[in-house]
Amino acid sequence: MTDPLLDSQPASSTGEMDGLCPELLLIPPPLSNRGILGPVQSPCPSRDPAPIPTEPGCLLVEATATEEGPGNMEIIVETVAGTLTPGAPGETPAPKLPPGEREPSQEAGTPLPGQETAEEENVEKEEKSDTQKDSQKAVDKGQGAQRLEGDVVSGTESLFKTHMCPECKRCFKKRTHLVEHLHLHFPDPSLQCPNCQKFFTSKSKLKTHLLRELGEKAHHCPLCHYSAVERNALNRHMASMHEDISNFYSDTYACPVCREEFRLSQALKEHLKSHTAAAAAEPLPLRCFQEGCSYAAPDRKAFIKHLKETHGVRAVECRHHSCPMLFATAEAMEAHHKSHYAFHCPHCDFACSNKHLFRKHKKQGHPGSEELRCTFCPFATFNPVAYQDHVGKMHAHEKIHQCPECNFATAHKRVLIRHMLLHTGEKPHKCELCDFTCRDVSYLSKHMLTHSNTKDYMCTECGYVTKWKHYLRVHMRKHAGDLRYQCNQCSYRCHRADQLSSHKLRHQGKSLMCEVCAFACKRKYELQKHMASQHHPGTPAPLYPCHYCSYQSRHKQAVLSHENCKHTRLREFHCALCDYRTFSNTTLLFHKRKAHGYVPGDQAWQLRYASQEPEGAMQGPTPPPDSEPSNQLSARPEGPGHEPGTVVDPSLDQALPEMSEEVNTGRQEGSEAPHGGDLGGSPSPAEVEEGSCTLHLEALGVELESVTEPPLEEVTETAPMEFRPLGLEGPDGLEGPELSSFEGIGTSDLSAEENPLLEKPVSEPSTNPPSLEEAPNNWVGTFKTTPPAETAPLPPLPESESLLKALRRQDKEQAEALVLEGRVQMVVIQGEGRAFRCPHCPFITRREKALNLHSRTGCQGRREPLLCPECGASFKQQRGLSTHLLKKCPVLLRKNKGLPRPDSPIPLQPVLPGTQASEDTESGKPPPASQEAELLLPKDAPLELPREPEETEEPLATVSGSPVPPAGNSLPTEAPKKHCFDPVPPAGNSSPTEAPKKHHLDPVPPAGNSSPTEALKKHRFEQGKFHCNSCPFLCSRLSSITSHVAEGCRGGRGGGGKRGTPQTQPDVSPLSNGDSAPPKNGSTESSSGDGDTVLVQKQKGARFSCPTCPFSCQQERALRTHQIRGCPLEESGELHCSLCPFTAPAATALRLHQKRRHPTAAPARGPRPHLQCGDCGFTCKQSRCMQQHRRLKHEGVKPHQCPFCDFSTTRRYRLEAHQSRHTGIGRIPCSSCPQTFGTNSKLRLHRLRVHDKTPTHFCPLCDYSGYLRHDITRHVNSCHQGTPAFACSQCEAQFSSETALKQHALRRHPEPAQPAPGSPAETTEGPLHCSRCGLLCPSPASLRGHTRKQHPRLECGACQEAFPSRLALDEHRRQQHFSHRCQLCDFAARERVGLVKHYLEQHEETSAAVAASDGDGDAGQPPLHCPFCDFTCRHQLVLDHHVKGHGGTRLYKCTDCAYSTKNRQKITWHSRIHTGEKPYHCHLCPYACADPSRLKYHMRIHKEERKYLCPECGYKCKWVNQLKYHMTKHTGLKPYQCPECEYCTNRADALRVHQETRHREARAFMCEQCGKAFKTRFLLRTHLRKHSEAKPYVCNVCHRAFRWAAGLRHHALTHTDRHPFFCRLCNYKAKQKFQVVKHVRRHHPDQADPNQGVGKDPTTPTVHLHDVQLEDPSPPAPAAPHTGPEG
């Protein structure tokens, strides 16, 4: 049976106090010492089964935010315990039932066997008694009547960091235990039984109580018919009735008499009765226990009479009711009486007859041999159980649980258990619906939300709906403008930690690499995408087709956005500030940011925008009935950075993929919980955050498709971050509330469940380019360069800092000298953790993560070379391998020679005698005819070509949009092989403009240049990608495909791109002067289908050639007639000479004809060389030269290898330049900066770029200049490629992107920077002066440039240390950055590992050979041995490195004391304690110390910064110890207690002085002048000042001298008008504290403690001795002699 009352109870436990509302209504009992508050209405609806009416006795309880965060609420309820009825809160509690009576509800239960019924009654009685005791304890605790053993002593609350009851000061291990305990003091009306009006402390106890009243017994015994309400009752039943089955309550009890064991305590007691009965049945004769008396009597009375009359002793009877034994003393009787107890502790002499008392004793534990001291408080004990109980309760918030495998520590044991699973790799919790596994059940509960469709959290600003509350809280940061995460390398800011982590990868290298093809990337999802697309063994991801056209995509969201933008256009977005319209919400957001200056998070801008937004703009259009919106909606996984209503145009991904920004990389594997610093733990669902609300949404009436994980290909690759003004870098996808369009219930899933990976706003090229008059100029001021402070010339480093660095180095080296002197002992010990060794190099570390990072990025030996799949050549960079495959691979050169690709049109070329290409025509078969390659481009594809300047000498081609010409001028369309004509221009004529077209007649461009139109013929645009027509290459950027077909297309080039290699595939037509035409790489282009024709202006001297035969002519009409008549090659198959009408049936005859009749076409280099390379055009006369050529050029042999790494090359000078990186020898330094180079060419390029800044190459379209031709090529491809839609308003330059225009404006038209307020540039009028040479500069930028060029600062590039001269810098580099030098040769290395490797390879065997040749007794035996293995060597550095591989380390032990350390510097600093050496001196005062850390600590005295602030009174100090000491004045805590007396103090030094002066009799410090002895050195120094007439403390104002520093500080106040001390009882102020104390005693005699009436102004600065003391005082008092130990 079920009870509706139980079903109506809330599901969540009351222990979740964070989920409660900030205000509660509780009914307190009548109190005698508290007032009655008025009624307060609660804003929270009650969910209790019996609503309690508001009565006059209600008490308001408020919630306060905890320290963990503003979202966590901690409720402190201040009332006392009591049992009340809902109707009458002022009534007394209900009368309790007598112990013998039972409640009516209990009698209604099912009768049980006698033993079970009695056992359950005992349980109920125990519960009643426990409840009565708890209530009584609560009342007693409220009145302060008693204190438990584990309670905190009043006044020491701040010492313990735990869960403490505010009423009775009791501590608990868990917060839930405290919350449950608080219900004793403050009864919860929701935990009151509606039948008996009894209060309980938890819902589980209330539920058990209700089940017991109803008689529902859910726990059944599997072996009998017994059933119980509680599980514990069933356990007790199993232990008592079924002994054979092991149970929690099953235990063994031994008989103290015969040691027989029993499982039941009752059986033991019955057994003990048998011993007593046996003793009573057969009583033994009583013998006198007095010495020398042999009296014995069976009669008890006679024996007692004998003792009394004979010995005068009264016998003591055993206290047991049935034991007849008699004893002489009470102690002997008590010792015997314990044998009647059933339970005896095996560890001590404790015995009892109560089983629960015996169990309680065992739980308390027993003291051990070792004293256990608490590390957080003075508690100490020998009992490990008491110690664990103390730490667990009193310091529950401390990190007391330590991982034995690593340094992880936590305050919660469950967290440690979960952490331990990291080391074992176990994931015990598995999802029942998928393969997801996790380590903690909380992770599994969060994961289960991925399988549900309920989204209970919705943003009130924009309608964003999600399943996780944490996602909503992170999402609300967008609306609040909380961009809390900022990149430390640029100005990027975002609101999510995972976005920042993804962004930081832009500043890093490519650390991830594919193991199959060496593909490198930065992000893990990129590698997964690559593996899935390139090496996935299964079927590829499915393609989602468009319902209206042939568009397909693997991303379903891209298809939906495509349909909306291209076909349906159901959702259109309008800008309220202009006429801009788009079908993509992200594009609208990007428009607002660029056109109207919207900054994400600017709420004022959003309000202004909302005021101008027309009504109804927030509502989306209603889809027509014939559309198909329902089957296109799918639930997508959402993220915190998601924005609703986002529709992404797929054309943006197709045409402008480089504009896409970074994506979310914070997905968990199998889970959607976000990663990051602040996304680590999801709060409980009961938490309520400001700015959000919790909604319980009903199920929608729309059937959605199943939720599927997006494929890996859905993640787009991150493009480089574009140049944006400061302040515009916002979070991904951030948009204001006015940008969202909540489409209603029917489409809310689409708007709320957009893929977070596609929500990033991207820019869309404007279809209407702005005119010059409309071009905005406001962005020019955005990029004004203000002179930063750090670019100013930095002052040289002070001498003290350089001295400190030198002393630190000396301290590290001095440790070896201390070992040799015998003052320090060095031993090798086995480390705690094992060492990790790299198998490919000598690298050793103790951290596994460091080894993994080294293996991925730093290991030179592990870096697997990139191998060519054809010839096996190895490369270190992907760039070198790509260049090798494109141009240099001999295998590919042989394969591609004479074997054109079937998809590229390669017309037959004329054969020149004596060339390699002439062999291709020996077969006599004509090559395949050319095929047209249509360029499938959309109408909006950005394929405009760059404009050329007007000064070009060549005539420009004009593209005409005229209709189709007459039939007579058009070519027949039914013969596609006969309508492509290639006019061949003469060599050397180049036209930088677009290749003209007229009647599909394409002139062949000259050598060395390829026109943009020719590039269009070589690629096509299909489904968002640019495809090369000559090879399988495809890409997303127009500039990439243009560069590919112009430079790197392997299929178009055929056999080679090397110098001297004959081109076999291009169409070569010899001209009249004997020159050859340049190669032609692409196929011809057909008409786009609209009938447009291109007018061609024929170049002078150009020839037209037939693409299917060698025919060529100078007139177009002759070529057209030739095509109409037909090529003879197609009919007869004869070969034609391209220079004359000669035809031949075979290729050999044609070659013989060309050699005899046209000798000018043959190579004009004299006689034919003897040897010719079969793979290239190289010729030579000697076989050795040819063999060397083939080894270097075609076989990939690199004979010159670096001895320090895997670098190899074919040139010796490259090896020498490379080796200078390792040795530092032969580096060529720059005379103007600290950089060095291996070759003079790199140095010259560096001087051109950095120092001279004299460019050598210039862009013909704008003002850009560079130092290499590649710079200009890259600039043209990126800034002038496509439509020049952005024109400069101040000059004639035009660009294809706004970013290029901004960069041009900064270069060519910079505005003078406005100086910051208060800067020197603003305060000083006129030009700026150089501080070194006095040069006048008009602007700070020019001054910085002048300083950088004329007065360069010599700075080390590795450590940024400045030097006055070039020689000092060179010496610094040799000593510091090549500090590891070989003692036997001139070798030097930057790292210690390199020197170790050098010793092993060069000098270990040599040293052994020299030792063997000396003829010593131990010849050949190395002097150094490894203590862990048989390794031997002769160099200490090698031995240390080897020992580190065993996990061992060197330990330095002081021979004067027990101090030991692993650090060489620390042992040096420690040794100075015994020697008194103090090399570190303060450069501002006479202070000196032994180690630099003390000096750094001392230097705070000379700084005014006080970063430690007291939260109580505002007191500021420089050291944290001062703040801790000051805080004890507010808390009254004195944690330092003398172990020998009751002395307590709040300072450790005061306790040390107390112990030395009060509890030490030895006076080791003696005065040499008077013979008086002292216990501390401080007292001796103070005493020595009495013998000295010197007064070292002199006032710097009046030159008055003082003997004590305090006297000078007090005197200094007389020279000021400050009165820091004041009376708290009146307005009296004084300069000294004793004056105020004297005033209080005189004028306020009623004040018990005069010191309590003294106050100090916290704003008054502290008087420091060095501020008021004269710089050259008299010499100080003589130092105390070292006559004893240090005090």
Curated annotation (Swiss-Prot):
<keyword id="KW-0597">Phosphoprotein</keyword>
<feature type="zinc finger region" description="C2H2-type 28">
    <location>
        <begin position="1536"/>
        <end position="1559"/>
    </location>
</feature>
<dbReference type="Pfam" id="PF23612">
    <property type="entry name" value="zf-C2H2_ZN142"/>
</dbReference>
<dbReference type="GO" id="GO:0006357">
    <property type="term" value="P:regulation of transcription by RNA polymerase II"/>
</dbReference>
<feature type="zinc finger region" description="C2H2-type 25">
    <location>
        <begin position="1452"/>
        <end position="1474"/>
    </location>
</feature>
<dbReference type="InterPro" id="IPR036236">
    <property type="entry name" value="Znf_C2H2_sf"/>
</dbReference>
<feature type="zinc finger region" description="C2H2-type 26">
    <location>
        <begin position="1480"/>
        <end position="1502"/>
    </location>
</feature>
<keyword id="KW-0479">Metal-binding</keyword>
<feature type="zinc finger region" description="C2H2-type 22">
    <location>
        <begin position="1354"/>
        <end position="1377"/>
    </location>
</feature>
<keyword id="KW-0863">Zinc-finger</keyword>
<dbReference type="Pfam" id="PF23611">
    <property type="entry name" value="zf-C2H2_16"/>
</dbReference>
<dbReference type="Pfam" id="PF00096">
    <property type="entry name" value="zf-C2H2"/>
</dbReference>
<keyword id="KW-0539">Nucleus</keyword>
<keyword id="KW-0238">DNA-binding</keyword>
<dbReference type="Pfam" id="PF23574">
    <property type="entry name" value="zf-C2H2_ZNF142_18"/>
</dbReference>
<feature type="zinc finger region" description="C2H2-type 11">
    <location>
        <begin position="485"/>
        <end position="507"/>
    </location>
</feature>
<feature type="region of interest" description="Disordered">
    <location>
        <begin position="1"/>
        <end position="23"/>
    </location>
</feature>
<feature type="zinc finger region" description="C2H2-type 14">
    <location>
        <begin position="573"/>
        <end position="596"/>
    </location>
</feature>
<dbReference type="InterPro" id="IPR056438">
    <property type="entry name" value="Znf-C2H2_CTCF"/>
</dbReference>
<feature type="region of interest" description="Disordered">
    <location>
        <begin position="1052"/>
        <end position="1092"/>
    </location>
</feature>
<keyword id="KW-1017">Isopeptide bond</keyword>
<feature type="zinc finger region" description="C2H2-type 20">
    <location>
        <begin position="1286"/>
        <end position="1309"/>
    </location>
</feature>
<keyword id="KW-0832">Ubl conjugation</keyword>
<comment type="function">
    <text>May be involved in transcriptional regulation.</text>
</comment>
<comment type="similarity">
    <text>Belongs to the krueppel C2H2-type zinc-finger protein family.</text>
</comment>
<feature type="compositionally biased region" description="Basic and acidic residues">
    <location>
        <begin position="125"/>
        <end position="140"/>
    </location>
</feature>
<feature type="zinc finger region" description="C2H2-type 23">
    <location>
        <begin position="1380"/>
        <end position="1403"/>
    </location>
</feature>
<keyword id="KW-0991">Intellectual disability</keyword>
<dbReference type="GO" id="GO:0000981">
    <property type="term" value="F:DNA-binding transcription factor activity, RNA polymerase II-specific"/>
</dbReference>
<feature type="compositionally biased region" description="Low complexity">
    <location>
        <begin position="1082"/>
        <end position="1092"/>
    </location>
</feature>
<feature type="zinc finger region" description="C2H2-type 31">
    <location>
        <begin position="1621"/>
        <end position="1643"/>
    </location>
</feature>
<feature type="zinc finger region" description="C2H2-type 5">
    <location>
        <begin position="316"/>
        <end position="340"/>
    </location>
</feature>
<feature type="zinc finger region" description="C2H2-type 12">
    <location>
        <begin position="512"/>
        <end position="536"/>
    </location>
</feature>
<feature type="zinc finger region" description="C2H2-type 13">
    <location>
        <begin position="544"/>
        <end position="567"/>
    </location>
</feature>
<dbReference type="InterPro" id="IPR013087">
    <property type="entry name" value="Znf_C2H2_type"/>
</dbReference>
<keyword id="KW-0225">Disease variant</keyword>
<feature type="cross-link" description="Glycyl lysine isopeptide (Lys-Gly) (interchain with G-Cter in SUMO2)">
    <location>
        <position position="1591"/>
    </location>
</feature>
<feature type="compositionally biased region" description="Polar residues">
    <location>
        <begin position="1061"/>
        <end position="1075"/>
    </location>
</feature>
<feature type="zinc finger region" description="C2H2-type 6">
    <location>
        <begin position="343"/>
        <end position="366"/>
    </location>
</feature>
<keyword id="KW-0805">Transcription regulation</keyword>
<keyword id="KW-0804">Transcription</keyword>
<feature type="region of interest" description="Disordered">
    <location>
        <begin position="613"/>
        <end position="690"/>
    </location>
</feature>
